Amino acid sequence: MSPRLSWCEIVIRPAVVAVIVAIVLIIIRLTPFPDIKNTHANCDRPCHELEWPMICRFQFIIESRRSLTRKSCDHCWKNASDCAGKKYCFIGDGSDRRIFTVNRLFPGPSLHVCENDILVVEVVNRLAGQSVTLHWRGQPLQETPAMDGVPMVTQCPVSPHTTFQYKLRASQPGTHFWQAMTGDTEMDDLFGALIVRRSAKLEPHRTLYDEDKPEHLIYLSEWTSRSGQSTLLINGMSAGKEGNFFPLQTYNVTEGKRYRFRVAYTTGHSGCPVSAQISSHSLLILALDGQPTEPKKVDSIHLVPGERIDFVLSADQAINRYTIRFKTSDWCTDLNVENFAILTYNSSHPSSKIITMASQSTVLTTVQDTGCGGHVTHCLSDLKSLEKLPDKLSGEKTDVSLTFDLQERNYSGDQTFEFDELDLRQGRSLNGITFTFPSSPLLLRPSDNSSDENLDCNDQKVPATCASDEMSNFCGCTHIISIPLMASVQIIILNPGANHLSGGKSNPNFFFHLHGQHFYLIQRRELAEFANLSESHLKSTKPTITNSVLKDTISIPPKSFTILRFIASNPGYWFLHEGRSQLWSRGMSVVLKVGQRDDFPDVPETFPSCGNWIGPEFFLA
């Protein structure tokens, strides 16, 4: 016989349940519900931790235009200050060149959303004879790996005069950007900001700044004119060919306030690192690649293409105008360029004095790890992530360990891998394998056993031509490495340091980007002579820092080895590649297959497919 409930229990229990239900209903009632009709205009808002995610709808119309045309710019080059603010007048470096625009904007639209908002981006390709995909740099896409935007890996390219709709969750807060992935360096100009903010209560550094304004974005890109000369653009603008011929990008601040600035180096055909500094001001570093770090104050920063840095600028100087300077690294003797912007206090009059650069004492460099740890040069090894290294990654060994040797091979005979007119028979590779894209997207394969026996490969299974010791044999295949879901992974990247490998004789650095994951930088070490690298250097790879920096893009210096670790928690096909279009599209890349097909999120049934087609055998009448 069950025990009889007391009168108190009979009354109190339902009352407690009723109170809990009432609280839940009140929270739901007061929390705005996502509206499927939301547009991008109402996604740029103060973020709140109790708010429902919004569905943010955008339309991207991609077109081919020209910079500084007479029709759009209306002869403004005769009076350069008239060019600023003219609709559809694209300044660039002041030269006439074909460019690619989104919604007739250059750079493309900046997307400002809150954490976990859902982006619905309808891409309309109006380019004649040019396909395109868009990659959402910094976003893991855990729910929608098919939206990663890697051609022939996660999707078919968006063909001319067709429309493709990307749907993804902005789950990774921070400073990011979207970009085209086509392998065409001309289309590297197709990019825009993707800023994912979080609520003030969840933002770890919110007390360190007063303002986080959309206009305080600094997006750098490398621009190459028709004559082959390169320069740096700041938000699509340059001072022009004749000094301050065109209006400089201006950032306004109010004396006494602290501002969060967001910097991204989006594209760089040369791969040349860039330094950034602001006269008379120090920079308080807050985050790298969207991942928060312990704050560190420096006077200047060096970064490579693909990287993002957030810093706080305190407007604590005299009311004036100050120079913001960006300059390519001294390593790049073939590309010695700089560009400027202006930091203006209290909307200072344009004729007021501009404070130029003074000597800078401390620098943060993400490029290399030489001369670190002192009071002058700070490297990635000197920064600390706010996220502790997981126990699964802190041991001597990991479940999976991969080594990639960056190589260049010369080919002869019929099997050649063409790059450009000056370099017809050279191919870049990882472990001697030049990545070749499949004829249909890997993510659309129906099962784990549906591989292409003639094209798929890994370090243990390669085509017959790859087995030869003859360097003249071309080893091209779809390089795929399988990794168990939730495995701890270690990647070692070896750079022998030959300058010509990097695609620029004066810049021996590579920079690699991993899709779908962030990784911890465990170690990066440069050697006087790469030939001295031995197993002893790599034998003990146990992390010595418990909160190594988290990144998705990393510079690989010459004559060095770099050790990265991550937990493979995101199932799908993820691209690991050199950052420049002319390298990743021509072999210096690999696909990491995380998990099995059953682990992958479902691809929509109507998802577009593509591939080879060979018609039936018949005779023409």
Regions found by a protein language model. Give the residues of each.
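Aromatic/His-enriched, Gly/Pro-containing loop or helix-boundary segments
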Residues: 99-111, 142-175, 205, 297-300
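N-terminal edge beta-strand
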Residues: 89-115, 238-254, 456-488
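Signal-peptide-cleavage-adjacent N-terminal segments of secreted and extracellular proteins
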Residues: 33-114, 120-122
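Acidic-aromatic/histidine active-site loop/patch
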Residues: 74-77, 81, 98, 102, ...
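Asparagine-centered strand-capping/turn motif at beta-strand->loop junctions
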Residues: 123-127, 263-267, 493-497, 502
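A cross-kingdom feature marking solvent-exposed beta-strand/loop segments within repeated
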Residues: 144-163, 284-312, 472-477, 545-563
